[in-house]
Amino acid sequence: MGDSIGVIKTDDVFFERIVGLLPMFVMKMENYQVIRTLEVCVKRNLGSERLFDHYILHSIEKNVLRYSVDLYSRMVRALADKGFVEDYVFWDKFAFRYVYDDPKVGRDRTFTHDEAKMLWDSFVYLKLKCPQIDIKEPLI
């Protein structure tokens, strides 16, 4: 009655074609969808530099201060896996600013113990994957 149907994985050409359609949807994506797209593209080594630089990274820059701690940690880890070290302005002006600025309350950001631990683990992961990035400022 219940013979399972084998799942056939497609080749990477199919995924590249799907990823080629993403630029027209990135601006309408929610923050968690952008980060999930980044994670999948990095894990499968899909997507062009144009998609990353002009669409995904642009969306992250606009919204990073609104991310939850979990979403921010996932972003840091995905960018570490990608080996994204070329843009120091992004790290200093946008990504590391998250630790200090909270636009929702208009003052310094505060974290619970678990959130601080999650951020610490993500920064250590970033430093291990990308030793060129100076993470002293957000950790102090």
Protein language model regions, located:
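Eukaryotic RNA-binding helical-repeat scaffolds
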Residues: 1-140
